[in-house]
Regions:
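Sec-dependent N-terminal signal peptides
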Residues: 1-15
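Secreted/extracellular ectodomain signature
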Residues: 13-202
Length: 202
């Protein structure tokens, strides 16, 4: 006697706003930056799905994704529990998009399973940018030894660069943009461009 067991899993979109996390209007990081938002360094888990993850994805979720709860983060899954995730992006929207693109390597359709948000998070408005904890540490605590000719550049995807010791503001700005651009995510052909922009130091 042969018995075949078939497990069917259906992922459905949430019915209410509270089920999908903060609603986002796409606000690209653009210059000039009018306000830089930074938050306390510890993030908060925001699980958007009640699905129980199997052992493999659950281990990745708990030990890799949630390690140190670094915002902005997103964890996306396929219907067969393939997954992709990112932490340390500079915006929630970028984290969601990158996690989806990473997940799509495992299957044709992905949904965001969970996010890591900063405490007190509010969606960005035009002219605002937000920073992940590591970049925020440099922004909030510039070393006086860096002098006046210093610059910082960031990308929504989490890339950033801080440079100092240049002969002029324009040289520092060009160096920061060039260095930051070396770390921008460029291996997802369907991911929108997230170029580096200059951030005014305090």
């Amino acid at each position: 006697m042969i018995v075949d067991f078939v497990l069917t899993l259906s992922l459905t979109l949430p019915n209410s706003v509270s089920d999908v996390g903060p609603l986002l209007t796409q606000i690209d990081f653009v210059e000039p930056v009018q306000q830089v938002l930074t938050y306390p360094p510890a993030g908060v888990e925001n699980r958007l799905s009640g699905l129980q993850l199997p052992d493999g994805p659950l281990t990745a979720y708990e030990t890799d994704f949630l390690a140190d709860t670094v915002f902005f983060g997103a964890f996306a899954i396929t219907k067969d529990f393939g997954y992709g995730f990112v932490t340390g992006a500079n915006s929630l929207e970028a984290a969601r998009e990158i996690a989806i693109e990473e997940c799509l390597k495992q299957g044709p359709i992905c949904l965001v399973y969970a996010e890591i948000l900063p405490q007190g998070y509010a969606p960005l408005e035009i002219g605002q940018i937000s920073l992940a904890p590591e970049a925020a540490g440099y922004y909030n605590n510039p070393d006086p030894a860096w002098g006046n000719f210093r610059a910082m550049a960031v990308s929504e995807d989490g890339a950033y660069s801080v440079v100092w010791g240049y002969g002029s503001p324009s040289e520092a700005s060009a160096a920061a943009l060039s260095d930051c651009g070396e770390f921008v995510i460029d291996d997802f052909p369907n991911l929108r461009e997230m170029p580096c922009i200059l951030v005014p130091f305090k």
